[in-house]
């Protein structure tokens, strides 16, 4: 009886070990893909800069396009209010 229980425990242990290894390998693969994508994005920004575009402005536009239209409008309104208060507009 103890041998059967030990065998089941060994199978469960092996399954958990294999599952953990698979998860870790997936994460490592995704991290490598993320690095590749980050490198590609950096190359695109470098290309844009080489063509005379302002990279800071491009990054701002990309960030703004990710926002919901209402959220972006609210942020722009607040920014404009602050700029007016400081005499910048």
From Swiss-Prot:
InterPro entries recorded: GapR-like, GapR-like_DNA-bd
Origin species: Afipia carboxidovorans (strain ATCC 49405 / DSM 1227 / KCTC 32145 / OM5)
GO molecular function: DNA binding
Full protein name: UPF0335 protein OCAR_5086/OCA5_c28780
UniProt cross-references to Pfam families, sorted A to Z: GapR_DNA-bd
Lineage: Bacteria, Pseudomonadati, Pseudomonadota, Alphaproteobacteria, Hyphomicrobiales
Family: Belongs to the UPF0335 family.
């Amino acid at each position: 009886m103890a041998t059967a229980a030990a065998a089941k425990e060994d199978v469960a242990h092996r399954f958990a070990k294999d599952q953990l290894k698979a998860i870790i390998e997936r994460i490592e693969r995704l991290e490598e893909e993320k690095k590749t994508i980050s490198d590609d994005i950096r190359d695109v920004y470098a290309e844009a800069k080489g063509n005379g575009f302002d990279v800071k402005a491009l990054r701002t536009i990309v960030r703004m396009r990710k926002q919901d239209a209402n959220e972006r409008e609210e942020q722009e309104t607040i920014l404009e209010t602050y700029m007016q208060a400081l005499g910048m507009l």
